[in-house]
Amino acid sequence: MPKPEIHPTWFNETPIVCDGKPLCYIGSTKSELQVDIWLANHPFYTDSQTIIDSEGRVERFMKKYGINSTND
């Protein structure tokens, strides 16, 4: 018998969202999954030579955790 209250909540219909639009639905422990790049907008698959302009990893981390980037 599994222990009660140790397992995460399971969502059967979790949307994968890109640019504010749900792309598909999967089962997950998260209520919503955000992606920046998807098959439909990836430069390799769309034959475009544009550079994807997104925030760098450090900037996203600092923004996520509310860290001020000024040197005090």
From Swiss-Prot:
Function: Binds the 23S rRNA.
KW RNA-binding (keyword) present: yes
Family: Belongs to the bacterial ribosomal protein bL31 family. Type A subfamily.
Keywords: Chloroplast, Plastid, Ribonucleoprotein, Ribosomal protein, RNA-binding, rRNA-binding
One of the record's GO cellular component terms: ribonucleoprotein complex
Domain of life: Eukaryota
InterPro entries hit by this protein: Ribosomal_bL28/bL31-like_sf, Ribosomal_bL31, Ribosomal_bL31_A, Ribosomal_bL31_sf
Subunit structure: Part of the 50S ribosomal subunit.
Keyword Nucleotidyltransferase among record annotations: no
GO biological process, one term: translation
Subcellular location: Plastid, Chloroplast
The protein's name: Large ribosomal subunit protein bL31c
Gene Ontology molecular function, alphabetical: rRNA binding; structural constituent of ribosome
